[in-house]
Amino acid sequence: MAKKSMIAKAARKPKFAVRGYTRCQICGRPHSVYKDFGICRVCLRKMANEGLIPGLKKASW
């Protein structure tokens, strides 16, 4: 879980545009965030397995 101070810091507009980065909207994780959903891979997998994201299911072949 991310610290509240880091989540607040990421929410502010950065002084320089290249310093901005995405965070997971659910847990605050800074890495491996999918832009389409706005959540990290860990939360995406958990929500997909529970069936909370329509049209997304586990692949099998």
Curated annotation (Swiss-Prot):
Cofactor: Zn(2+)
Highest taxon of the lineage: Bacteria
Chain sites annotated for binding Zn(2+): C24, C27, C40, C43
Keyword Ribosomal protein: yes
Co-factor binding comment: Binds 1 zinc ion per subunit.
Disulfide bonding pattern of the chain: none
Short name of one Pfam family: Ribosomal_S14
InterPro entries to which the protein is assigned, alphabetical: Ribosomal_uS14 (IPR001209), Ribosomal_uS14_bact (IPR023053), Ribosomal_uS14_CS (IPR018271), Ribosomal_uS14_sf (IPR043140)
Protein family (similarity comment): Belongs to the universal ribosomal protein uS14 family. Zinc-binding uS14 subfamily.
HAMAP family: Ribosomal_uS14_2_B (MF_01364_B)
Task performed by this protein: Binds 16S rRNA, required for the assembly of 30S particles and may also be responsible for determining the conformation of the 16S rRNA at the A site.
Self-association and partners: Part of the 30S ribosomal subunit. Contacts proteins S3 and S10.
Name the record gives this protein: Small ribosomal subunit protein uS14
